[in-house]
Regions:
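Signature of long, low-cysteine stretches enriched in small and polar/charged residues
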Residues: 124-174
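Extracytoplasmic
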Residues: 66-70, 103-105, 150, 181
Length: 214
């Protein structure tokens, strides 16, 4: 069942934020004829790892919760709203454009953060890490421009997932709410092969993300 499969992906993504690897370029070789043993480069700390390391509590929020922050994403034609599949706030997909056993998908998480934090520091230092830590990630574009007046990191790229090259666009936004903060995580995913054909859909989704406070 399609919704069950996407729900499983949502749970895995939330539980495994930051898994994967990044392979930056190697430095120029030395003149020595003896090969040197080098440790693999350290992965950047994911958003989730960093928040836990500084004692910030992380609680997924559903649309039915009394949270003061709401997230809306208008869906292009052919996309279906599958609702809030815990822990995701919203999951949508386009079943008519399945490719290599996958449907294009859009996933939103709304996460309540408890504890003091510097939102701009978190975004600037860890906003790209979840994407960078995916398998064989290749960046296409990124931005640290604010979104709707809030600290934000957006990144687009491709990575390998179970033998399929995936094209993903992601945005993290941290919204202050008194002593609390809310983290909005939004990802739109297609296969690399269909990314050009679905570029208008992706643009409508990513440009339509709306964050409101009560």
């Amino acid at each position: 069942m399609r919704s069950a499969a996407l729900a499983a992906v949502a749970v895995a993504a939330f539980a495994m934020i930051g898994c994967g690897s990044q392979n930056p370029g190697q430095p120029a070789g030395s003149a020595s004829g003896t090969p040197e043993s080098t440790a693999p480069p350290a992965k950047p700390a994911s958003m989730n790892e960093y928040l836990h390391s500084v004692g910030v509590t992380v609680t997924p929020v559903s649309p039915e919760s009394p949270a003061n922050v709401r997230v809306d994403v208008p869906l292009p034609r052919g996309w279906e709203n599958l609702g809030a599949l815990d822990p995701a706030y919203l999951i949508a997909d386009k079943p008519s454009d399945a490719d290599q056993g996958r449907t294009p998908s859009a996933v939103v998480y709304l996460i309540k953060l408890g504890g003091p934090l510097d939102a701009r520091k978190v975004i600037s230092e860890h906003g790209f890490a979840d994407a960078q830590n995916t398998q064989n990630f290749r960046k296409i574009a990124s931005s640290l421009d604010d979104y709707q007046g809030y600290p934000s990191a957006a990144i687009e790229g491709t990575y390998e997932n179970q033998g399929v090259r995936v094209h993903a666009w992601s945005r993290d936004v941290i919204v202050p709410d008194g002593p609390l903060h809310y983290l909005v995580q939004f990802t739109v995913t297609t296969t690399e092969a269909q990314s050009a054909a679905l570029s208008q859909d992706v643009a409508a989704l990513t440009g339509g993300l709306k964050i409101t406070k009560r």
